[in-house]
Regions:
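Extended alpha-helical targeting/anchoring segments
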Residues: 1-313
Length: 313
């Protein structure tokens, strides 16, 4: 067990622990294996993740409200649906990360802008000075290298669907704060944009760009093969995307990180009121990563969940 949730208004989450046998040992062994692949020249970066799980009782919408209060997500999302097995499921996402945004041309004519904002590099502020932590993150050669690799990957992906020569890096490196208090995290981000080809369909955009580079690695296909080999289960909604497409042509799709996925049974009213909560956390593995350091980074990414559900023991 990593921690136990407190009773909250509208819901309760039980003991939070690893969702698969091996837990920390399995994850750190996976990091070591990724480092072997990197040294062999197979890959430059792999985003390796593991699953935290707990029992859930109550109203998933109350959990979503708690995640919003704790994480102040810029790209949060809430979805209720029934899976292929007929089970009720909920996605409660407190995502800070933008996968894709389409901004129509302001003049009402012509083609607008397609934009992506990958994140790489995470720090919890804890008791330290926020400005000091921000300076350390901004100066971290490891985190800058992680982000630079993904910026190059996303430039390439955008180039597959945008006009020749239109892809540009609007911001190569910026530090953003997401969440407050114990849930507050500092993130290194970049912004890449381009002018999509006229007549482009969203199906073509997703075929070229999904899943996001920040949650896979580089090169993307080889990184995904390694993820499939080393992670204990399919990710499901985690690291996918939830989006909205508006009548004016604008659209915004997140990367489904910092996301609770609840699977359960229906009550007499047909609502999900109990089940299992899964919360995946991951880290970008590069040549100078250490298994211990990457494990610690993954747990920092559970801060918003811990703040939302409480941390009783």
């Amino acid at each position: 067990m990593l921690w136990r949730g407190d009773a909250r208004v509208g819901f309760r989450v039980g003991e939070v622990g690893s969702g698969a046998a091996g837990g920390r040992e399995r994850f750190e062994a996976g990091v070591a294996r990724v480092l072997e692949y990197i040294r062999a020249g197979d890959v430059y970066q792999v985003n390796l993740a593991h699953r935290l799980s707990a029992s859930f009782e109550g109203d998933p919408r109350a959990l979503m409200a708690a995640l919003v209060r704790a994480g102040l997500p810029r790209h949060g999302a809430y979805v209720e649906f029934t899976d292929d097995a007929g089970r009720p499921r909920v996605i409660a996402s407190a995502s800070p990360e933008l996968f894709l945004e389409y901004e129509p041309a302001s003049c009402g004519g012509g083609v607008g802008t397609l934009r992506t904002r990958p994140m790489k590099g995470t720090r919890g502020t804890g008791s330290a000075s926020e400005s000091a932590v921000a300076r350390e993150l901004a100066g971290s050669a490891k985190d800058r290298a992680e982000l630079a690799m993904i910026v190059d990957l996303m430039r390439n992906d955008l180039g597959r669907v945008c006009d020749l020569g239109s892809v540009r890096v609007e911001s190569a490196h910026a530090i953003e704060k997401h969440g407050e208090g114990d849930a507050g995290l500092l993130q290194a981000t970049a912004t890449v944009a381009g002018t999509p080809r006229a007549g482009l369909r969203w199906s073509e955009v997703f075929a070229a760009m999904f899943p996001g580079g920040s949650v896979t690695g580089a090169p993307k296909i080889r990184a995904m093969q390694i993820i499939d080999e080393l992670e204990e289960a399919r990710r499901g909604p985690y690291c996918g995307s939830v989006g909205v497409f508006l009548p004016d042509g604008s659209a915004m799709c997140n990367i489904a990180i910092r996301t609770a996925c609840i699977t359960g049974e229906r009550d007499h009213a047909g609502m999900l009121r109990s089940g299992t909560l899964d919360w995946w956390v991951g880290a970008g593995i590069v040549a100078d990563s250490t298994p211990e350091g990457e494990w610690a980074e993954t747990l920092a990414k559970a801060a918003v969940l811990r703040a939302a559900i409480g941390s009783g023991t």
